[in-house]
Amino acid sequence: PFGAEMCKLVPFIQKASVGITVLSLCALSIDRYRAVASWSRIKGIGIPKWTAVEIVLIWVVSVVLAVPEAIGFDMITMDYKGSYLRICLLHPVQKTAFM
């Protein structure tokens, strides 16, 4: 009932949020390892430039990896017991050579 825009937007947001979560946990694990392995180098309070770069990089990589979801999903009309239903699926035949 929401159309092709929502059909493409929901899988895109799902994939992007999973990517952001996984990459953030990886970055957190690396940061905690560095803090434990070299505890004498812990600096003062604040957000270092490298941390800000990591956060931006995590978001950019996650969004870029989620783009194929937005491209591939589409509203498909299917015949089911004599009635036609429009459902949101990964399109079985892609229109571009990308996928």
Swiss-Prot record:
The chain crosses the membrane at residues 9-30, 52-76. One of its GO terms (molecular function) is endothelin receptor activity. InterPro entries: Endthln_rcpt, GPCR_endothelin_rcpt, GPCR_Rhodpsn, GPCR_Rhodpsn_7TM. Disulfide bonds join 7-88. GO terms for cellular component: plasma membrane. GO terms for biological process: calcium-mediated signaling; developmental pigmentation; endothelin receptor signaling pathway; enteric nervous system development; regulation of blood pressure; vasoconstriction. It comes from the Eukaryota. Belongs to the G-protein coupled receptor 1 family. Endothelin receptor subfamily. EDNRB sub-subfamily. This is Endothelin receptor type B. It comes from Macaca fascicularis (Crab-eating macaque).
